[in-house]
């Protein structure tokens, strides 16, 4: 193997690889999706060189597979991500996130008066695609926000 072809992040035998995450978003995904709440090994590549993106992040989670719902929820943060299923060091499935109709438990409502902050309820947002933006409407306070506002929260 030449120096140019060397893997920058170690291969995994079985699990999930989330590739083409925009740079600086990898840690946010780990936190929001609670991906670190596992005993499985997680490998993270940050600011890796990418021909398409310039720089990208990468997450590899051994012996763990994301559900379709989890893959689709990635679309707000990493709409061009590729989620690869790995078995015996081979890619056995590839998927890309699609914008879901609803996102539950992952995001926090930016409305400080929203009941979701004081009550033991999981957040829930309806997702609406706009011309140049994505709107998220909180199930509890019914306020609508640009996804940029919710993501920055």
From Swiss-Prot:
Binds 1 zinc ion per subunit. HAMAP family: Asp_carb_tr_reg (MF_00002). The keyword ATP-binding does not apply. InterPro entries: Asp_carbamoyltransf_reg_N (IPR020545), Asp_carbamoylTrfase_reg (IPR002801), Asp_carbamoyltrfase_reg_C (IPR020542), Asp_carbatrfase_reg_C_sf (IPR036792), Asp_carbatrfase_reg_N_sf (IPR036793). GO terms for cellular component: aspartate carbamoyltransferase complex. NCBIfam families: ATCase_reg. This is Aspartate carbamoyltransferase regulatory chain. Zn(2+) binds at residues 109, 114, 138, 141. One of its GO terms (biological process) is pyrimidine nucleotide biosynthetic process. The lineage of its organism: Bacteria, Pseudomonadati, Pseudomonadota, Gammaproteobacteria, Enterobacterales. Belongs to the PyrI family. Involved in allosteric regulation of aspartate carbamoyltransferase. Keywords: Metal-binding, Pyrimidine biosynthesis, Zinc. Contains catalytic and regulatory chains. It comes from the Bacteria. Its cofactor is Zn(2+). It holds the Pfam family PyrI_C. The keyword Metal-binding applies. One of its GO terms (molecular function) is metal ion binding. It comes from Enterobacter sp. (strain 638).
């Amino acid at each position: 193997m030449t120096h140019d072809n060397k893997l920058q992040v170690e291969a995994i035998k079985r699990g999930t690889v989330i590739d083409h995450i925009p740079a600086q978003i990898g840690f946010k995904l780990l936190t929001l999706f609670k991906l670190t709440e596992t005993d499985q090994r997680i490998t993270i590549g940050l600011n890796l060189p990418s021909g398409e993106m310039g720089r990208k992040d990468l997450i590899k989670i051994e012996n763990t597979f994301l559900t379709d719902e989890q893959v689709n929820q990635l679309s707000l943060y990493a709409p061009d991500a590729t989620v690869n299923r790995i078995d015996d060091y081979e890619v056995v499935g590839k998927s890309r996130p699609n914008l879901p109709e609803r996102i539950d438990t992952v995001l926090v409502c930016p409305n400080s008066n929203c009941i979701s902050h004081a009550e033991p309820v999981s957040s829930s947002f309806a997702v609406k695609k706009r011309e140049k933006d994505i709107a998220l409407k909180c199930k509890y306070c019914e306020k609508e926000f640009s996804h940029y506002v919710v993501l920055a929260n």
